[in-house]
Structure formats: C-alpha cells, structure tokens
A protein has these predicted regions:
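Acidic, metal-coordinating helix/loop segments flanking the phosphotransfer/catalytic sites
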Residues: 8, 32-52, 92-93
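Active-site residues of response regulator receiver
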Residues: 56-57
Length: 126
C-alpha cells in the first residue's frame, strides 16, 4: 500500500481519470489530477510533491503525454512516468524508446496490473 506518496494522473477521459484516481486513493496514495498536458505540466512545475506521473499518451491540445513528461523532466529529472497507451498511440513514444524510470501500460489493462505496476515504480528509488 501507499505510504503517502503523491501521484499525478493526467487523462482527458473523465471516466478513466476517475477510475485511476479512485484506485490509487484506495491503495493509500495522495492523488492530483489534470485533464490535459498544460494542466499536468502546471502541477509538475509547481512546488507540489509528485512521486509518479501517470499519463495518457494521447492528450488533446498542444502537448501529448510524452511531450509533457519530457518538459516536466527538465525541472524534475528524477520524475518517474507511467504512460497509459492504446495500441495506436505507441508511435508517439518514439517506437518505445523510453528514458530511465519510464514504463508503458497498454489499454485495456486490469486494475490489478495497474496497481502492481504503480507499486513497483513508486518503490524504486533513484
């Protein structure tokens, strides 16, 4: 279970975002959320504690999830990122070229799979 870590969830689909937020809160994490890259980046560039970013790759607007994560890592180089992606969006991740402490969870996924992936990533230290 979470030990008070803070996770930022960015997804433009309210139903998906709420499902993930509810799951993470049930697991004991503190959760922040945003519906697009600009909102997510604003939180990431604030002073808020964020231990893990979970973002959909395909976000509306000027910035997709990968671009937001890359921009956030300028200010937070140690940021851990879990990308949620549909098969068609995998190309946005540069053919799977991910930096350290980045991982992909492909839709559709089970609650148990997501919970385990989050636990593994949050537990990994630096």
């Amino acid at each position: 279970p979470g030990r008070g870590e803070t996770i930022l969830v960015v997804d433009d689909e309210p139903s998906v975002r709420m499902l993930v937020v509810d799951l993470l809160e049930d697991l004991g994490y503190h959760v922040l959320d945003a519906e697009d890259g600009a909102g997510g980046l604003a939180l990431l560039q604030s002073g808020a504690r964020i231990d893990l970013l979970i973002t959909d790759v395909g976000l509306p607007g000027m910035m997709n999830g990968r671009q937001m994560a890359d921009a956030a890592r300028v200010a937070r180089p140690e940021l851990k990122v879990l990308f949620i992606t549909g098969y068609a969006e995998t190309a946005l991740l540069d053919n799977g070229q991910l930096g350290p402490d980045m991982a992909i969870l492909t839709k559709p996924f089970s609650i148990d799979t997501m919970a385990q992936r989050v636990r593994d990533m949050v537990a990994r230290h630096g």
